[in-house]
Structures are given as structure tokens and as C-alpha cells.
Amino acid sequence: MRRFILYLALCVAALLQPWQRVAAQEYEALDYRDFKFYKEEDNDISLWAGLNDSLITEPQTRSYTPNSRYALSYATSRYRGEPLSESRSLFGNTVVDYTTLRTLKALGYATNEQNGISRAQLSGSTNQTTAILSGAESRLYERQSLYADLSGRNYLIGINHRGVYSIDKYGVPLKEGWMIMDYARVRTGRDLYVEGVFTNAVDIAVGASYNGRNDKLDIAISLPWSQRGLRQASTEEAYTLTHNKLYNPTWGMQNGKVRNSRVATSLRPEVIAMWQRRVTAVTDLTLTANAYFERRGASTLSWFDAPTAAPDNYKYMPSYYSDDERVIVERAWSTNDLHYTQIDWDRLYLTNSVQQDGAARYAVTLRRSNISHIAINAGLKSRVGIVTLNYGAELGGDSEREFRVMDDLLGATHIRDIDYYIMDDASYSHLTDNNLRNPNNIVNEGDRYGYDYRLSRIGLKLYATAEWSLSNFDFAVGAQMMPELIWRRGYFEKELFAGKASFGRSQSITLTPAMINASCRYSIDNHNISATLMLGANTPDADDLFMQPQYNNRIVNTPELATTISSEITYSYTAKRFRATAAIYLNSTTREIDVVRYYDDLAGEYSDAVVSGIGRIRYGIEATARASWSRYFSSSFALNLAQYRYHRNPTVNIFTDNDNILIAKTISAMRGHHIGAPEISLYGDICFRHNGWMARASVQYWALSYVTPSVMRRTERVLSYTASNEETEALRFQQRLPDAATIDIALSKYFTLTEETSLGIQFTARNILGSNVVYSAYEENRISLRRVGSRTDVTPFANRLSYAYPRLFSLSVSLRF
């Protein structure tokens, strides 16, 4: 009865207070407007997974501590300028993704984070490796916790419960035995700051851990589901006219209610298990298996032989017009006329209703991804004298089926499954069918249309590491290689590429990525110095190995591995009241490949551009420190000074999408341009702790951040069309984003209610200065061609960016028992 009353009291208290935790729910599209190709870039982890919901009050002495990493996430502050995919997590010897890591942490597993490459022999990461601890090291202990929050950011209400239960042998707790874990979380409601953003999500996970004398077993099963209305980047012109830095162009009013055209859904059942056994006195066996099937969907507003419905399209902005027309459009935007600034759902329904054939001109479509993954790893760990060997093999495969589904015809009866972009093309207008295998090309709601294909990969990874110690020196080396096959299978036969050119299995691509890593460490007294070098060859993304995977089996002409050279030197000092770490790092990549699918304004064609020979370099200095000034006061600091740049000019081969004829071979002037992450970031805080109270104030600062550059607009081909130096410089120019600083404060108190029960309350205020911080920004691939007399002006499209949330307040409550 007591526990029930505590549950009820906490729920009531939490629902009366606002609280926020999760990072900005951004949706960064490369180019969402009236283009034939639309590629989602889900690089922001916050799109697909929430952050850890535990109270973070204890700074840790590592490069970029949880406090500083969380605070600096207010802007897109990539660690060492790397993509998030470079952060790896290990469960045993198997690399798992962020969702799996989040599940195991939610179930109570402890983790050990190692920044940089000093412990990347198995993960291959140039960023950060997180080891998920198992068995006795997992630090599982019996407890339960209940957590509820009222949040105005991304969602409104959230409740979760987690529990760890021991199964005691003979009725008494023992070091050996079973631990059972469960975790459940529910979030629902709309964002109070950004219109159209909402979340409905349920996470469920159960697990079991057995710790025996010679055996250890860990198994977890999870089922996260989510549905989220998303936010999308726009132009500075739109933000200025609407007087709203959180302007979101993806929604509009329908029947008096807000409707978002971009809704992401995800369902992912997963199981992961690891068994460890001591087979001899010096050898341990570890078997790991991981499998999941993820069903993703992302809706978008589509148009068929009709003008774009995107409200912030450049053709609908005041800057597109002149004289009287400009004044009218500017007035509509500045007065927030929803018929101009947002999607006009009523107009779309009306347009569909007057079509004599009943066919839709506008519809909401769903891009679906069914992703399956399986990995089976067998590893041995042997101790031979002073040397510890870790070696094994992993068989793994991934399959991603991509297709489009008609979600809502907006009052119409059907569409035809044809390529609307070549209907008026003199050469290809008779080859419009998207699927010759379906003679009846009528598409109703719920039908697949447009494209349907699968990308598959299978590989066998072989790995080995060795570690040994000599006096004050530690040495480690590691190597791995993974021969793999990649192929495409088309389920639609597109008329443009009839037969095996689009239908059935493509030729297989055979690649063998590999990595070697060597490190040494010297320790004496309170000082520790380490040096690490890593060389790697990595496989490109599967969709960058095909010209147009949606409906074409053609492989790019030169599929090759990207090469990586990474090194770092780290120094750390540990004393009773002071800890510090400093690192010098370098990461250089070459021979990267990317396929850009876009509308080429010079050719007037939808095109596939194969960009090869991309080279990037990232180097810098980072440092962290923690000082205990007294019994009650402490501080932590983090600093990163870096350069993130392109160091090579890539080759660009541009092909027509309709027939893969080479339009141009050119070079892009990318050398010297910035990659697009803050190159200076600072964090500092001061914290007070006493008798269950904690108060902390922190300052964050970002500088030298640039808009992510476009390769296509800097090609020699585009620059040759300019009529003046001013036009050339405008295309070459890379915008620097404003430097930003924020101040956060946090206040928490833990109450001990009984011997086994405690209550925690934490108040936080983020960005109390109310600073306008650019969260992320990127350049468009398209250019504008305008005829002025006898000349043609060539200008770039406006950059697209999104802003972080303004001043935010939150209150969280947690109960442990």
C-alpha cells in the first residue's frame, strides 16, 4: 500500500511541473522542395532515440564529460568534428548501435566511455568507444525507480519505470545468481514551442543477467515504438519575416486543427545476448548474438504535375518578386498569414476535388524503410604470460528494403504510377511507367508505388588484439578485416531501365575494409602519457555505391574504400583535488565517395553526381579539468580548439538520371572549406554540494562554426558560367555562423524518505540569456539562373538553417525504492 501511495504522489507532483530533457527534435533534409529525389539525413540521434533520463549531477573527468557533452549539444557540436556514426558501442566484442546502447543503459547496465582512438582496437572508432559492462562489472543491483515529467519540448507528458530484481538462492543474496531487469517508458503530447512538433512513444524492455563461477549470461529484449511530428530547416528570410526563430514550414491548418506533413514512425523489436565461459585457466570464450528488425516511416507532402506545396519554396518568398508583387507577398509573410506561411491544406483538397479524372495532384506519401540486422560473434581471450590476446570472428549482415506507400490522397481517388518528371520530355515521355510488372498502374491509398528495392550486405569480420605491460609501459595492437558483399535487388521494373537494369539482383560489389591500431602508454606517479596510431580502410554507404538505387542496378564506375589515418597523444594528471586531461589529435580521410542526386540547373536535368576523391582533415587540441576547491565546491572545464576542413578537391562526374549519359566531368573547389562543425567550444561550471543539495551554474561557448558546404555549386563547371568576380565569390563563399554563448543553471535536492526510498527533485534553466543559437545549417545544391538583358546571372540558393530552442525551464522528479 505504501508503494502505491508513493507512485500516486509522484505522478501527481510531476504532472504539475514542466520539465525537458531531450535534444531538439530537428529534421535536416538536404533539399525537400520540388525535386525528383528526396534523401533523408537522419544524422541527428535525437530523431530516433531519447537521451538517458537519469539526473546528471556528477561531472566526470574525461574529455567531454556527460555534463559538458549535454550542454554543448545545444548547438550541433560534433565531437572532434566527426559524424555521430563514428561513435561506437561494444557489447562483448560486437559493435552495437545507439538504440541498443540506450536499451541496455535503461535496463541498468553500466558503461565505460573512452574518447578518441586509444581503445579502438575492436570498435574501429575515431571518435568515442563505449564499452557496455556485463556480468559482475555491469554493477547491477536490486532497485526500482519511477519517473514522471511534464515537458514542453518535443512531448508533453512522460512516465517511466525501471526495476532490477535479484533471484536469491536459498533466500539469501549471493554474488552468483540471476538478476532480472525491466524498463517501460511512455511519452506523449505536443511541443509547446514549435508548432506541429509532437511525440507519441512507448519503450519496453526486459532483460536477465546470470553471474556464475565459470559462466556469465546476459540477454535483453526490447520493443521501442514512436511517432513524431518533425521540424524542418528553413531560410533566414522566413525566420525574419515571421519574427520566429522556431518557424516550422511542415504544418498547416486543416478543419481548425494543426496537421504536420512530416511524421516519422519507428518500430524495432530487438534481441541481444552474450554468453561468457572460462574454458581453461587462461582462456575465456565469449559468444554474442544481436538481431533486430526495424520498420521506419517518414511522411512527406508530394505533388504530381502540379506546383510545389512547400510554403517556404523560393518561388513563394518575397525575395523572388520585385516591385508591387514583392510588397504584397512580404506583407502576407510579416503578418503571419497562414495561407502563405504554412501548408494550405484546404487549397490542396480543393485542387484535388476539381480534377475531372479523380486523380490527385497533391498527396501525403510515406517513405518506408524495413531494416533487418543480424550479427553472431565468437571470441576468445587468452592470457599468455604478460600478453593478453583477444581474437575471434563475426558473421553479420544487413538488409534495408526501401519503398514508397500512398498514405493519404487528400480527397482524390488515385494516382497513376508513372514518372511525372518526364511526362513532357520529348525523348522519354513514352517511358514513364515506374513498374512494368504491374500493367494496372493505378495507385490507391495503402499501395506501394514509385520504387521498391532492397540493399543487402553480408560480411565476415576477423579480428585480433594483443595487450601487454612492461614496468610502467603498456602496449596494445589490434587488427581487423572484413571481406563483404553488397548488392541491390529491385522489385519494380522501371520502363526507363527495363529488364535487369532495374529488376532483380544487381552485380555484387566485393570490398575488404580493414583497420590496424597501435598504442602505448607510460605511467609514473600521477602522470600518464599515451600515443595511438590507427590506419583504416572503410566501406562507403551502400546507397553511395549505386547510381540511383531507387530504380537502377548500375554501380558507380569506381567503388572503392575510403582511407583513414588517425593519431593522438594524450596526457593526464590525477591528484586528490585536481584532475586534468589534454590531447592532441589528427584524423585525415581520403578517397571518400558520395553520390548527390539533384536537379542540375545548367543542364535542366535531374542528375546523379558521383563525387569521388573527397578528403577531409580534422585536427586540434582538447583539454578537460576538474578541481575540488573545498569540501563543498568543485568545477569542471572542457576546451576544444580545432580545424575541420576539406583538404582535397574531389572529382565530380555528372550523369543524366534518365539514361546515365555523362553530362560533365569536373572538379569541385572544396580544398580549404570548413566541414561545418564548431571549431572552438568551451565549457565551464561551478558546483556546490552539501547534505543532498546540489547547485550548478555552467557556461557554454561555440565559435568558428560554418554552414555545411555544397560540393555541387563549387564545381569548375558552375563557376565557368559566372559573368563577374562577384558572382564567382558568392558561389565560393562559405557563411560563418554567429558565435554563441549560453548560461545554464541547475538545482537539485535528494531526500531520504526511508532506508530504501529516496526522492530526487531537480530544477534546470537552459540558455537563461535567451541567446539565438543556430543549431545547424547547410547549403543548397541548386543555383539560380536569371536572364538579365544579354547576360545570365548565376547565384546560389539561400542557405537553410534551424535554430536551437530559446530560454527553457524544467523540473524533474524521480523516486527510487
Task: Tell me the role of every PLM-derived stretch.
Residues 363, 388-524, 549:
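Signature of Gram-negative outer-membrane beta-barrel scaffolds
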Residues 217-274, 297-365, 428-443, 595-597:
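Acidic/polar loop-and-plug regions of large Gram-negative outer-membrane beta-barrel proteins
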Residues 58-60, 94-169, 176-177:
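A beta-strand signature from Gram-negative outer-membrane beta-barrel systems
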Residues 247-270, 274, 506-515, 519, ...:
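Outer-membrane beta-barrel signature, preferentially recognizing the C-terminal barrel domain
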Residues 469-472, 584-588, 606-713, 816:
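Gram-negative outer-membrane beta-barrel transporters
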Residues 155-231, 263-281:
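Transmembrane beta-barrel wall of Gram-negative outer-membrane proteins
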Residues 234, 438-442, 485-496, 522-567, ...:
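Surface-exposed extracellular loop regions of Gram-negative outer-membrane beta-barrel proteins
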Residues 4, 25-33, 701-720, 747-817:
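C-terminal beta-signal and adjacent terminal beta-strands/loops
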